[in-house]
């Protein structure tokens, strides 16, 4: 979009597991931007089909016939090691393998793609949606992540933004964004809980809001609990029921599984509004006796029973979040429901039980996070005044000390930005160096927490054990990404690192992916233009052949031959895989000759009218009401081939043309 000027807007993007959404501030209000397909959310799906890369709705449409090359729910893999995703691998039809550094990566047609690259494709789609609406090139964004994402996952999300060509001004938690959207116009002090059950993750955040200050008091959650898991229990139920009925196991049939996935998602959504739903999947498989059809009825009560253990998993994080905030349920003034799964009646009932009040359903759970991200973009861009956001880190940070113990420096739910320092010493006499192992988690032993970085402080002057003073400092920015330093107080020697995601990408890898994305963007654009031109040519052939068939008796034979020649020209260009310019040229030529059909018929109609007028005195007296029953249509037939558009031969002369 180089022809556009650079926009000053900072867009807000909710990069969701199932769907994504983009919003922007306009006239002091956050506006959700509709995609080119006319939807306010876009499926977070990327598919590879031949040389084509599909993103969003087109990718979702072809998933049933191309499951192994259709990548959905990839957010569950971002910033994670292959060794950490065994259970997630079981639920997806595509290939997940181990990358060069042990990261989880996807393999399609022998080529590896990182979750960051796939996330970047979705972000690029969001960027293009915003650019099409604003008419300007967008370069800056606020992107949301689950509140309980660790540092690796946050940093990897930021990398995805860079690959998409975005300067990510801030990474903010989804519940915090939702609270911004809810509270931006509220007066007075309130304590609110944001219950966010989305497609792949669950978060609960407790906030205090008032006078433009949004302070996160605590956050908790489960990054492995979401709508995908609710789909999965329905899929397993369908597989078991079908096996009982037909003796056939559908669990190894990827194409059938994709159909079951779509059916489960549809049933889940329907059961939020009705007490039972029919699941019909004809020709789901076949055996020696012929095709088999799946036809089942799922009631809301059955679904709630299947999903009971999943709903139960939301309770503990809520209780912990209240405890960390030093509040009880009765202290909460309002509970916001966020994420598509929060529409499930049993989930809403659980929220009511936990907090002792009806949850607030006044926000759109699919859009509120993107709206909040846009508001934060407005704050950073100076468009929104008098708003201060005080967020927290979701997990404790510390280092490994003697005995394999994790010593915590920054407790979870500490408000950020923040800086914490602590003095440590050596464990042996004349120890020349120390290795600082940086950890994230809540377990007492280092091995049970996530290692997110390590570095060495060397050249420590010889001294008895316990004498050297090593100052370790944690400096955490507003994005929740941090720097760690270690300094020998006596010598002043210091070593520091910016904690990059341990499952993240190196700078050279990011730069390569940025270049690849830009190159692919141009190639994708050319492929799309080629596809559009071929589709238009094919459609023009169909319309021309139909017009000849319908109007052959009413247009000159010379015109029929001219059109038939040009139909052949277009057909040959398609068959020979001619350059796009050539295909466009012959298609345009055919289109111009198609217009001559209407011109010819209008000419004939005018001649007939003139003839009728000349003979009006001696001609028969025709009732105009009878004439209307035998009207000519000079418009070309519609693409649907409806017989209503065909010309009828008039069995009367037209004597009056004024009613046209």
From Swiss-Prot:
Region (Disordered): 591-660
Residues with PTM Phosphothreonine: 201
NCBIfam families found in the cross-reference section: PRK00290.1 (NF001413), prok_dnaK (TIGR02350)
Family as reported in the entry's similarity comment: Belongs to the heat shock protein 70 family.
Pfam families linked: HSP70 (PF00012)
Protein name (database record): Chaperone protein DnaK
One MF term in the entry's GO annotations: ATP binding
Sequence ranges of Acidic residues compositional bias: 646-660
Keyword Nucleotide-binding: yes
GO cellular component: symbiont-containing vacuole
Biased composition (Low complexity): 600-614
């Amino acid at each position: 979009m180089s022809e556009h000027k650079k926009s000053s807007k900072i867009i807000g993007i909710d990069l969701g597991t199932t769907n994504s959404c983009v919003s922007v501030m306009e006239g002091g209000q956050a506006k959700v931007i509709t995609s080119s397909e006319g939807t306010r959310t876009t499926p977070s799906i990327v598919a590879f089909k031949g040389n084509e890369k599909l993103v969003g709705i087109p990718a979702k449409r072809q998933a049933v016939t191309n499951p192994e090359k259709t990548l959905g729910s990839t957010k569950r893999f971002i910033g994670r090691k292959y060794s950490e995703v065994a259970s997630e691998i079981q639920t997806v039809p595509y290939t997940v393998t181990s990358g060069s550094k042990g990261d989880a990566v996807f393999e399609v047609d022998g080529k590896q793609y990182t979750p960051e690259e796939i996330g970047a494709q979705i972000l690029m789609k969001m960027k293009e949606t915003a650019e099409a609406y604003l008419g300007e090139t967008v370069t800056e964004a606020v992107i949301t992540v689950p509140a309980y994402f660790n540092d690796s996952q946050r940093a990897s999300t930021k990398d995805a933004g860079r690959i998409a060509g975005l300067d990510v001004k801030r990474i903010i938690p989804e519940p915090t964004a939702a609270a911004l959207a809810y509270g931006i116009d509220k007066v007075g002090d309130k304590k609110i809980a944001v219950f966010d059950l989305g497609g792949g993750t669950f978060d609960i955040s407790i906030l205090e809001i008032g006078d433009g200050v949004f302070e996160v008091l605590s956050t908790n959650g489960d990054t492995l609990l979401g709508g995908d898991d609710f789909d999965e229990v329905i899929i397993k139920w369908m597989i078991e029921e079908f096996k009982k009925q037909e003796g056939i196991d559908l669990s190894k049939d990827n194409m059938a599984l994709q159909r079951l996935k779509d059916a489960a998602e549809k049933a889940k959504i329907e059961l939020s509004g009705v007490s039972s739903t029919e699941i019909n999947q004809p020709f789901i498989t076949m055996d020696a006796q012929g095709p088999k059809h799946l036809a089942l009825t799922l009631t809301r009560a059955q679904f709630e029973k299947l999903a009971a253990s999943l709903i139960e998993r939301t309770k503990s994080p809520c209780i912990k979040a209240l405890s960390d905030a030093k509040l009880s349920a009765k202290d909460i003034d309002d509970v916001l429901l966020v994420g598509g799964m929060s529409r499930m009646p049993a989930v809403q009932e659980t929220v009511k039980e936990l907090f002792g009040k009806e949850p607030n359903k006044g926000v759109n759970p699919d859009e509120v996070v993107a709206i909040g991200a846009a508001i934060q973009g407005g704050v950073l861009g100076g468009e929104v005044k008098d708003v201060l956001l005080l967020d927290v880190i979701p997990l404790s940070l510390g280092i490994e000390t003697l005995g394999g113990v994790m010593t915590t420096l920054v407790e979870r739910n500490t408000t950020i930005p923040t800086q914490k320092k602590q003095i440590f010493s050596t464990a042996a006499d004349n120890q020349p160096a120390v290795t600082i192992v940086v950890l994230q988690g809540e377990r007492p032993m280092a091995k049970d927490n996530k290692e997110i970085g390590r570095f060495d402080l060397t050249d420590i002057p010889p001294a008895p054990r316990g004498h050297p003073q090593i100052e370790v400092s944690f400096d955490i920015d507003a994005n929740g990404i941090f720097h760690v330093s270690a300094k020998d107080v006596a010598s002043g020697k210091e070593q520091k690192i910016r904690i990059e995601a341990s499952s993240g990408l190196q700078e050279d890898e990011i730069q390569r992916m940025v270049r690849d994305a830009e190159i692919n963007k141009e190639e994708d654009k050319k492929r799309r233009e080629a596809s559009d031109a071929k589709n238009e040519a094919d459609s023009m052939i169909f319309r021309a052949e139909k017009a000849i068939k319908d109007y052959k008796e009413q247009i000159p034979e010379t015109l029929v031959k001219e059109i038939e020649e040009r139909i052949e020209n277009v057909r040959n260009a398609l068959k020979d895989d001619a350059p796009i310019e050539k295909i466009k040229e012959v298609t345009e030529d055919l289109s111009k000759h198609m217009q001559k059909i209407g011109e010819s018929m209008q000419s004939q109609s005018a001649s007939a009218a003139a003839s009728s007028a000349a003979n009006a005195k001696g001609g028969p007296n025709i009732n105009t009401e009878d004439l209307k029953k035998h009207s000519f249509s000079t418009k070309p037939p519609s693409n649907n081939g409806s017989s209503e558009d065909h010309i009828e031969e008039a069995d009367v002369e037209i004597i009056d043309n004024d009613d046209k």
